[in-house]
Each structure stands twice: as structure tokens, then as C-alpha cells.
């Protein structure tokens, strides 16, 4: 399931050359690049190249349809769109769109943009320079673009690195590269020297094979992916003694799934709660959690994160009472792109209103109690009935 590998030196050079090509096309600091590409090497190269120019990258999940691509493109008004021919439908005609190959070969990745041997001027350090836009799942209607700058990505790196997946080892991204779980974390993963296994199309048997073959210490993804791995016919053909943790987010994990995963992989299961707006950082069950915490809660705030449950008047409620979950974390988005009114309603006095209902139990763990809307979750993404 793996394509030709590319080393860090080559990745740096290729993204340098593509950055110069992007600059010749008019991308500059503050420009917006929209990627409607598979989760492969061209996506990664384009993201790095844009960042080297100070441009902002927004990604479209390949699973979305044409009408959804239309909404996302209109949300961010990109200066340039890169798309493969199977993922271009719905991109408005008035935008500048380039069709590119989805080839994962280093020699072919965005070849039309490469300026051999050239590199862009290095930008001065600026913690407030925007880097990426991650689209929300549309739990209250149309998706919104959550903007993240260097400051937030550095905070995420500080909070997220090490732990369950260590540093400098092998990792399989559990989401599409356009998802907040990848876009806000690729930076620290690359800086740590991680070997990333990029999968255009996630398949349980492929992931199980990679985990076994490369002795990958952490299983990551959403609950539905874990269920597919447990049910895959090839599961018992593999040795998973290497697995030290199962780290799952993007939606609830049923107790029966947690129990089965812990038993079959022989590893602890950390259920994570976060949101696009929080940068994928929030609450987590401990790897050494007792059954009550592991099976029925989303744990406690991770280091560096504050959490509160408040009523409709924004006042903290007593333990055991249900209210809206608020988070305070340096990883939270800068704003919603082009939506100051909703930003002001969501980011309040340094806190992020999640729109999720929760209560705190007698162990200090948080238990979710639904949302204030009627969306449902599919593979880590909220799905709007419309």
C-alpha cells in the first residue's frame, strides 16, 4: 500500500522549487491556496511550498461532493486552486484552477510548478502569520473556515508531540490531510523526523499491514476505522505487540468497541475530544484510565487545556449538571475566515464555545450529552441532513 518514499532533504528541495513556481503564479504572503487533492505527496508538497511563501492553505476533503466543494471554495475565496480531474467538480468557474496529477512520485509531484535548483527567500519569523484554514464539519449549517497561524501551530506542537506516538517514528495519519487532525499537526510531525505513511484511500487491511510491517506504536483515527480494523479478515494474521496505544477522536467511541480494541490490540485506548476550532486539542481519557473513565467518558483536559461547563447565561454549573462545554487553549483558531460576527460569538474572553453539551462526573471526567443541533457524525465529520 506504499508508494515510492521521499526523504526529508528531497521533500525540502521539491517544496522549495514548487514555492518558487507558486510565486511566479502570483502566490505571496497572505494569498490563499485551495487544495482539492488526494491525501498524497502532491498535497503535502503544495502545503509546505505555500507555507514557505507565507501563503495560506485550505484543503478540501476528497470525500466531499461537488456541491460541498462549491461552498468551501466560496467560503475562502482562494487566489489559486489545485485539483485533480476527479476532484474539480463544483469549483466555481471564475476561480483560477489548475489541474494537476495526483502522482506520488517525487519526480512528478507538481512538476509543472517546479523551478529546478531554486528556493524562495526565507521569511522572517512571525507567530501571527496565518498558515492554514481547516473547514468545520458544518454542525450548524454550512462549513466555516477556521484560521490558524504559526502561534497556534506551535502551541499544538508543544501539547501534542511525544506521548502516545513518540517522536521520530512511523505514523499513519488517521484522517484526510485536509482535516484539522492533519493540517495543524503535520508541522511538528515533520520537525520531529516522523516517517509519515500517506494513504490516498484509507483501507483497514492496508493500515494493519503497515502497523505490523513497520512496528508502528500507535493506532490513530476515528471509532469507525477502529471497528473496521477489528473486523478485517486479516487481523489475526498480524503481530501487534508493537502497538502501545490506540488514540481515537472525531466522535464517540462505544464502550463495546473500546473493550474489544483494548483486548485485540493488547493496548490502552485513549478517547479524545476536540473540535476543528480547538485545533484538534481538548480532552482525553488517560492511557491508564479505569474502566469507568475509559468506557463512558472523554476524560479530562489535556495539559495546557482548560475546560468549563456553563449554562445559557455563561455561568459555570455545578458538577453533575449539564451545560455547554467551553475550552480554553492556546491551540484555538485565530478566527473564522471572513466571519467576524460568528467568531465573536464563538471566541469569548479567551474561551472557545464548543456547542457541545457535557457534564463533569465525580471523578472529574467529562461526559458528553449531545449537541445543540441535530447533526450526525460520519467518519469524524458532522453530516448536515441537507
Predicted segment positions?
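Conserved AMP-binding A3 loop
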Residues: 5-9, 131-155
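ANL superfamily adenylate-forming
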Residues: 86-127, 154, 233
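Conserved AMP-binding/adenylate-forming core of the ANL superfamily
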Residues: 1-40, 44, 48, 65-70
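Gly/Ser/Thr-rich phosphate-binding loop
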Residues: 191, 216-220, 230-292, 306, ...
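Conserved pre-ATP/AMP-binding loop-to-beta segment of ANL
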Residues: 114-135, 142, 164-170, 305
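Conserved AMP-binding/adenylation subdomain of ANL enzymes
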Residues: 154-170, 178-218, 232
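Conserved structural elements of the adenylate-forming
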Residues: 12-20, 127, 146-167, 174, ...
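Conserved ATP-binding/catalytic segment of the ANL
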Residues: 316-320, 324-386
Amino acid at each position: 500500500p506504499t508508494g515510492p518514499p521521499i526523504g526529508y532533504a528531497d521533500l525540502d528541495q521539491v517544496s522549495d522549487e514548487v514555492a518558487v513556481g507558486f510565486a511566479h503564479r502570483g502566490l505571496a504572503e497572505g494569498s490563499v491556496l485551495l487544495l482539492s487533492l488526494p491525501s498524497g505527496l502532491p498535497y503535502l508538497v503544495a502545503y509546505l511550498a505555500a507555507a514557505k511563501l507565507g501563503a495560506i492553505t485550505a484543503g478540501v476533503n476528497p470525500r466531499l461532493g461537488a456541491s460541498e466543494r462549491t461552498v468551501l471554495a466560496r467560503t475562502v475565496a482562494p487566489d489559486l486552486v489545485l485539483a485533480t480531474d476527479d476532484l474539480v467538480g463544483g469549483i466555481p468557474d471564475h476561480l483560477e484552477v489548475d489541474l494537476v496529477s495526483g502522482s506520488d512520485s517525487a519526480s512528478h509531484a507538481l512538476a509543472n510548478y517546479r523551478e529546478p535548483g531554486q528556493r524562495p527567500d526565507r521569511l522572517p519569523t512571525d507567530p501571527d502569520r496565518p498558515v492554514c484554514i481547516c473547514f468545520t464539519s458544518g454542525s450548524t449549517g454550512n462549513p466555516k473556515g477556521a484560521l490558524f497561524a504559526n502561534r497556534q501551530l506551535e502551541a499544538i506542537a508543544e501539547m501534542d508531540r511525544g506521548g502516545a506516538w513518540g517522536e521520530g517514528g512511523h505514523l499513519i495519519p488517521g484522517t484526510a490531510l485536509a482535516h484539522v487532525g492533519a493540517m495543524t499537526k503535520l508541522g511538528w510531525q515533520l520537525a520531529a523526523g516522523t516517517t509519515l505513511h500517506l494513504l490516498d484511500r484509507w483501507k483497514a487491511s492496508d493500515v494493519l499491514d503497515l502497523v505490523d510491517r513497520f512496528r508502528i506504536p500507535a493506532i490513530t483515527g476515528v471509532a469507525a476505522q477502529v471497528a473496521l480494523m477489528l473486523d478485517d479478515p486479516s487481523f489475526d494474521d498480524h503481530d501487534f505487540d508493537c502497538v502501545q496505544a490506540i488514540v481515537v477522536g472525531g466522535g464517540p467511541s462505544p464502550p463495546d468497541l473500546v473493550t474489544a480494541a483494548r483486548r485485540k490490540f493488547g493496548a490502552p485506548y485513549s478517547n479524545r475530544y476536540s473540535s476543528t476550532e480547538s485545533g484538534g486539542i481538548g480532552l482525553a481519557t488517560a492511557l491508564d484510565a479505569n474502566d469507568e473513565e475509559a468506557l463512558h467518558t472523554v476524560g479530562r483536559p489535556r495539559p495546557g487545556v482548560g475546560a468549563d461547563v456553563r449554562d445559557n447565561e455563561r455561568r459555570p454549573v455545578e458538577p453533575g449538571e449539564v451545560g455547554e462545554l467551553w475550552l480554553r487553549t492556546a491551540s484555538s483558531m485565530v478566527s473564522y475566515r471572513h466571519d467576524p460576527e460568528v467568531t465573536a460569538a464563538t471566541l469569548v474572553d479567551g474561551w472557545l464555545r464548543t456547542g457541545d453539551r457535557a457534564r463533569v462526573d465525580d471523578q472529574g471526567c467529562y461526559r458528553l450529552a449531545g449537541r445543540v443541533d441535530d447533526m450526525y457524525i460520519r467518519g469524524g465529520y458532522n453530516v448536515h441532513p441537507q
